[in-house]
């Protein structure tokens, strides 16, 4: 079974995040960019599938700027056998629709596509479902755990009121929560071997796609962006005043 793991490089959550008011996009320059933590957990699930012999090949796929190589190498050390890095200046600031189109084209030959339920920078949580729709495949959302038997993947999803057990025939798309896997620090051998693994750098054109705002048949448009208004001081009520009311 070929497993594709979707990976995203995001600004470190421990640092302050700012929005560029002229574009409405997250400022990524001048900050530490890292592999999204939830993607490390997805890699842990893929590593277990590989260890069990269920996954015969694990490929990491990311869409991002050229400086995402460091993040890719970490994922190669964690679980992946190879990686596909989609790079194009026209992809900067892509909305979820364009992101799903590009990632779906890159991952279409996978038997199982694993993704984090939502990224820490955008939090849209819609890209996996969009990919499934584009590829015509079933989608299991927000799975806390998965099991694979023959050509069936089963995921357990917990809602506020109940627990759901969902099954789908592969090829399929599954989005995983932070409960799905526990990432492990790669050892020195894994880090060294990751430097030798293949990373295919491709463009949307290589995938048979056009990129950019004019290429999208439907897209989100940022209308305006403004700084959050400063918080006003709360009204102070003395103990004596409260007692008399």
Positions of predicted regions on the chain:
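N-terminal glycine-rich FAD/FM-binding segment characteristic of electron-transfer flavoproteins
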Residues: 1-245
């Amino acid at each position: 079974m070929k497993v594709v793991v979707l990976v995203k490089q995001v600004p470190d959550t421990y640092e302050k995040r700012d929005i560029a008011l002229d574009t409405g996009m997250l400022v990524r320059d001048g900050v530490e960019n890292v592999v999204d933590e939830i993607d490390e957990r997805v890699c842990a699930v893929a590593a277990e599938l590989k260890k069990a012999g269920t996954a015969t090949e694990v490929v990491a796929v990311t869409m991002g700027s050229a400086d995402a190589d460091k993040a890719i190498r970490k994922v190669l050390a964690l679980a992946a056998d190879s990686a596909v890095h989609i790079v194009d200046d026209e992809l900067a600031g892509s909305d979820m629709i364009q992101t799903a189109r590009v990632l779906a084209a890159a991952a279409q030959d996978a038997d199982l596509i694993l993704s984090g339920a939502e990224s820490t920078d955008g939090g849209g949580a819609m890209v996996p479902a969009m990919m499934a729709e584009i590829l015509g495949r079933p989608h299991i959302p927000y799975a806390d755990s998965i099991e694979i038997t023959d050509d069936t993947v089963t995921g357990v999803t917990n809602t506020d009121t109940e627990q759901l057990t969902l099954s789908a025939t592969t090829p399929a798309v599954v989005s995983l929560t932070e409960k799905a896997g526990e990432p492990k620090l790669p050892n020195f051998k894994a880090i060294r071997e990751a430097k030798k693994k293949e990373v295919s750098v491709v463009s949307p054109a290589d995938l048979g796609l056009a990129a950019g705002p004019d290429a999208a048949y439907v897209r989100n448009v940022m209308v305006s962006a403004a700084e959050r208004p400063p918080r006003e001081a709360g009204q102070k009520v003395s103990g004596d005043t409260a007692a008399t009311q």
